[in-house]
Amino acid sequence: MKKSMPKPPRAFNEFSETFPTLRKAWDLLGDAAKEGPLDDRTARLVKLGVAIGAMREGAVHSSARKALALGIKTEELNQVVALASSVIGMPSAVAVWTWLRDSSAKK
């Protein structure tokens, strides 16, 4: 059974209220990016990997929350970090792993 997506953080909602046109453009970009052969699960893991590689803490938290809502297991998210470790280095991998722990603890 597919879970519903988690609500965005309050700061995101406040930003969206302040800049509604940017929010609309953001939603359109997200919808356009979904077109293609990847299923939701694969796309979510790819987005997590990109967020990890870019060391974007907020994006890692968001991707993890959404992945967990899709039913992706914490162990699978941890494997994405392990796969990224040889690219981003051990200190960065440990930092990302703590971000994932934050997201997993909130579910």
Predicted regions and their residues:
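Mid-chain, well-packed structural core segment of small domains
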Residues: M55-A82
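Amphipathic, charged-and-aliphatic alpha-helical interface segments
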Residues: R44-E57
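C-terminal structural segments of small proteins and small subunits
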Residues: E75-S103
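Residues within well-ordered alpha-helical secondary structure of globular protein domains
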Residues: L28, G49, L83-S86
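Short acidic alpha-helix initiation/capping motifs at coil-to-helix transition points
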Residues: T21-D27, A54-H61
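Residue-level preference for alpha-helix termini and adjacent loops
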Residues: E14, P37, A51, A59, ...
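Acidic, glycine/proline-rich low-complexity segments that act as flexible tails and inter-domain linkers
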Residues: M1-A43, L68-A69, A95-K107
